[in-house]
Amino acid sequence: MALEVKRKRVDVDLILDQEKAEQVAALGDDLQRAVSQHVTEGANAAAKRIAKQIVQLRDEVKDQTIRITFEALPLSKWRQVLEANTVTENGIPKQRIEDICADAIRSMVVKTVPETPVEDLANVMTELSDGQISPIWYAIRDLNAKLIDPKDALESASRIIRRRSAS
């Protein structure tokens, strides 16, 4: 039987309008704060108001938003992306996130809504603000560089189950 690796996927929404993207992010932060407040009587009116603002803003930027589905790369391809985008200056390796994102997008994008040419997405990376590119970078980085070692969790679970069985 041939082994088959199932690579993780993640969706990221890219809002091309920087100002609106920042407004959505700020409202998201406000919503988190409002939700974390302990409201004892009735519903959290502030959270509802902020949520409605986010939905309204989302509708306004619908035509300027691209949902990108990324799939993790095999290690050898991820290494090639990093090596191609690393330069050494005075013995110090340096990388530009926008260049890594552009190259990774060419290999990692499996779907876009609305349908958008992958090359167009790669080319727009140098035009994005830090706030716009950050969610893309975090998705790419986490899909390809996050340590996944379930051994400790499996061993801990086994010890706990054995202890409970012995009791």
Positions of PLM-derived features:
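Predominantly late transmembrane helices and immediately cytosolic-facing juxtamembrane segments
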Residues: 11-17, 21-23
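Short, intrinsically disordered N-terminal pre-domain segments
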Residues: 1-6
